[in-house]
Amino acid sequence: MLKIDILPLGDYQTNCYIAREENSQSCAVIDPGYMPEQVLQFAEGKGLCIDVILLTHGHFDHVGGVKTIAEKTGCALWMSQADWSQENTQENAFFYPIANCDFAPVNFCEEGQRITAGDATFTVMETPGHTWGSVCYLCEDAIFSGDTLFAGSCGRVDLPGGDWNTIQTSLDRLAGLPGDYKVYPGHGEYTTLERERKMNPYIR
């Protein structure tokens, strides 16, 4: 059974998720935000070993803590190549600052790829639209949706990399997943996929 701890961090209350299999000390950190010391202190307090950082996208409020955590733990880092490539342009440096981080090599994830943290396995689902390379991570009955899908809403598309038609396609893909999932978004309260199918005005 997957155990999930939620740390809302910073002025933007970005949800950092620490996910692991019950009775396992190896965990994944999904979107560490930009307050890395809080993440590290939480993990240390629980006796957890951070195996991987999984980034749903490259916006600064989700990635600011990556360098510190990666340096102190030696963990692997996964994100989409599409967001990484766009981060390497000057005009996008504010929104996508991760390219300025000189930490260990980035691993680029792709649709359907399976990434492990201890006994937990996360499957990559490409969901562009909020950014060029936004992804969700599925693990058991959980979806870590980043800024693609929120409770009752969806991610904004007016920043570099945003596109309404693209995010609509991604939302349709999420809604079309079989069965129900708990949805853990980048901001705000968690929800369920079934609830969003019924109540979310952005899901057709």
What is the predicted role of each segment?
Residues 1-46, 136-146:
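Conserved beta-strand hairpin/beta-sheet module of binuclear metal-dependent hydrolase folds
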Residues 5, 54, 123:
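Conserved Rossmann-like nucleotide-binding pocket used by diverse enzymes
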Residues 7-9, 105-106, 126-128:
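Short Gly/Pro-enriched turn/cap motifs at secondary-structure boundaries
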Residues 12, 35, 59, 83, ...:
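A generic "binding-loop/recognition-motif" signal
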Residues 29-30, 51-58, 77-80, 126-129, ...:
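Active-site neighborhood of phospho(di)ester-bond hydrolases with catalytic His/Asp-centered motifs
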Residues 34-117, 198-202:
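Active-site HxH/HxHxD metal-binding segment of metal-dependent hydrolases
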Residues 92-95, 121-126, 131-204:
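Metallo-beta-lactamase
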